[in-house]
């Protein structure tokens, strides 16, 4: 890490570290960056930043209103979570095609999923659990530790530290690089890290700062502390949505920001690093406000496209006509665009034969296509819904 680049930051200090790098077995003696606790009042921000902050607030309000107008927002939450899961994992270098994720989501055997898809599905499980709980529990290190254990389960990041604040030194940089050559070295494990997390946990409950600004500050601090040995980026971006819900800016987990960030990965990483080097929050808050606005507007458009498709599906239900479980599956396609007879039987509590017959009716009605070409283990997809989700 370029120590000179961090020397002038008034919002943190360099602390000495030494030990054995667990990745290489080599000894190191260097310094890590320890951020000071976040300010209790809004840091000085320029008019150039307050404008996108205001625009983000308006966009989030429109998204929240759109969520309120949907009879079953939980159905729309499903594709939002899975879209976010694919992009947030891609930001960490784990790439899985969206359709592969949805197919694995309904697969009978977990072992059928590739390692990349498994990581994405772990995130889906984590996000659904967190969104179900956030109305009842505040954001805390304990909650995130529970989520972390699920996030890394069965992946290369699964270790004895899964579900616990890390007890090893980690670095951010090219794989295999020396500690001294890392792009960023987070605080060492121990009392300083634990204290920093405690301050962060207390700060995030503070409602005296504009929610958009607060999201930016909290996300930076979480990434700078890097409390876990893996999965910090994915958890940190999930906290963005949880934080907005706790603050009342949103009521449903319909926001996705990682698709926008994925397209600006280097800029995202550079902004985070620059705050640690300079202590200047202004460009970072502006960047995050732009991400929130873009994510909210994309979600609003996605909801509109899906509801339009649902209206078309309802027309097919009426005119074909479709009844019973076939009508239920058709009604839910905007949230479950990939189905199998086994999954449908489980979801709608009917026999395999009834589910299979219902899917055959949807195939005849043109609402589904079979994508495997197999006689057994067939998978059925609504291509229109997939396209609408991916935009």
What residue spans do the PLM features occupy?
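FIC/Doc superfamily catalytic core
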Residues: 1-391
């Amino acid at each position: 890490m370029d120590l000179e680049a961090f020397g002038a930051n008034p919002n943190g200090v360099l602390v000495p570290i030494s030990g054995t790098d667990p990745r290489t077995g080599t000894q190191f003696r260097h310094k890590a960056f320890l951020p000071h606790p976040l300010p209790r009042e809004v840091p000085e921000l320029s008019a150039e930043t307050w404008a996108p902050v205001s625009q983000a607030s308006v966009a989030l309000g429109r998204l929240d209103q759109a969520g309120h107008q949907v009879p079953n927002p939980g159905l729309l939450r499903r594709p939002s979570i899975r879209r976010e899961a694919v992009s947030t994992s891609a930001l960490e270098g784990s790439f899985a095609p969206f359709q592969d994720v949805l197919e694995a989501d309904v697969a009978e055997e977990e072992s059928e999923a590739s390692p990349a898809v498994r990581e994405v599905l772990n995130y889906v499980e984590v996000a659904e659990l967190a969104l179900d709980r956030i109305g009842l529990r505040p954001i805390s290190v304990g909650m995130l530790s529970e989520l972390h254990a699920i996030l890394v389960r069965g992946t290369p990041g699964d270790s004895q530290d899964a579900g616990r604040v890390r007890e090893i030194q980690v670095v951010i940089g090219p794989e295999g690089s020396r500690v001294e050559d890392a792009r960023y070295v987070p605080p060492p494990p121990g009392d300083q890290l634990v204290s920093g997390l405690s301050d962060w946990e207390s700060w995030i409950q503070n409602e005296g700062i504009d929610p958009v600004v607060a999201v930016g500050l909290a996300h930076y601090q979480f990434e700078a502390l890097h409390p876990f040995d893996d999965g910090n980026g994915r958890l940190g971006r999930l906290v963005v949505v949880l934080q907005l819900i706790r603050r009342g800016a949103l009521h449903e987990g319909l926001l996705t920001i990682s698709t926008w960030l994925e397209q600006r990965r280097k800029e995202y990483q550079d902004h985070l690093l620059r705050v640690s080097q300079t202590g200047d929050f202004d460009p970072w808050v502006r960047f995050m406000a732009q991400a929130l606005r873009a994510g909210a507007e994309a979600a609003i458009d996605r909801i509109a496209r899906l509801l339009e498709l649902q209206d078309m599906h309802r027309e097919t239900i009426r005119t074909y006509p479709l009844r019973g479980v076939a009508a239920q599956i058709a009604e839910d396609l905007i949230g479950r665009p990939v189905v199998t007879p086994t999954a449908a039987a489980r979801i709608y509590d009917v026999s395999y034969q009834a589910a299979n017959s219902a899917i055959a009716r949807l195939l005849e009605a043109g609402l589904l296509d079979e994508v495997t070409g197999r006689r057994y283990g067939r998978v059925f997809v609504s291509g229109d819904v997939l396209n609408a989700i991916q935009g």
